[in-house]
């Protein structure tokens, strides 16, 4: 049985209700399956890489088998997590939508007559291995990827132990933690020397692991939600021409 350390950064100490509901269901299901679970939250840390490094530092002080990153705005199903543990991969994560609407994809979905538009509105946090053509992905099998987000990522302890060999160390100067402690900078935001892109801390983490022979997998079976805000805009009369409201031909009014 596995010992899972759930880590969630919470800027401002805030989280969404769907996250709390999902987390409580996860704890119940992991415990029922014989797994141990512990949770750690990082409040009011505005520097994301430092927050993730500090949570990883806490994880490494204990004896848990897995560090499970879950962002505070993610909705998830406990059965998907159990399958991730059973997959027995060094790094495996779920692919979740970005907080944006892909309008070009929505337009294409409407033109194609898609019935379930909600599944065609998002862009996803993932970099595929082969992004030049079509990639065949089975829903029931892990799929190797170049990088994915730490919003929903399960990492084995052995990954961090191996990465220590080539990861820089900095001394903690935050008064909220023990000053002077040496912390591994697993999560950084460097410029990729090959592409010139500024990498996010999670993509950098994946790139470093793969650069030294590791593999990263996505769990296509995960059904995730990403809580966000949206400004609903519009006007009853969008042009200078008169319009007819109601009746199915014009804007609906209540």
Segments from the language model and where they lie:
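Conserved catalytic core of nucleotide-sugar-dependent glycosyltransferases
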Residues: 56, 77-189
């Amino acid at each position: 049985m596995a010992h899972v350390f759930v880590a969630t950064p919470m800027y401002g100490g805030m989280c969404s209700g769907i996250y709390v509901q999902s987390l409580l269901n996860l704890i119940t299901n992991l415990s029922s399956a014989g797994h141990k679970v512990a949770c750690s939250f990082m409040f009011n840390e505005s520097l994301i890489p430092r927050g993730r490094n500090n949570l990883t530092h806490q994880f490494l002080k204990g004896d848990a088998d897995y560090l499970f990153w879950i962002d505070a705005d993610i909705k998830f199903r406990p059965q998907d997590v159990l399958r991730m543990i059973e997959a027995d991969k060094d790094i495996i994560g779920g692919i979740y939508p970005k907080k944006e609407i892909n309008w070009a994809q929505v337009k294409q979905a409407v033109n194609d007559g898609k019935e379930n538009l909600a599944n065609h509105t998002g862009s996803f946090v993932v970099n595929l291995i082969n992004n030049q053509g079509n990639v065949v992905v089975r829903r029931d099998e892990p799929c190797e990827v170049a990088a994915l987000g730490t919003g929903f990522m399960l990492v084995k302890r052995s990954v961090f132990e191996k990465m220590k060999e080539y990861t820089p160390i900095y001394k903690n100067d935050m008064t909220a933690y023990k000053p002077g402690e040496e912390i591994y900078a697993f999560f950084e935001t460097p410029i990729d020397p090959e592409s010139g892109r500024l990498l996010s801390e999670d993509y950098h983490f994946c790139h470093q692991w793969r650069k030294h022979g590791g593999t990263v997998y996505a769990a296509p079976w995960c059904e995730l939600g990403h809580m966000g805000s949206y400004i609903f805009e519009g006007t009853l009369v969008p042009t200078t021409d008169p319009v007819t409201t109601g009746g199915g031909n014009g804007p609906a009014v209540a």
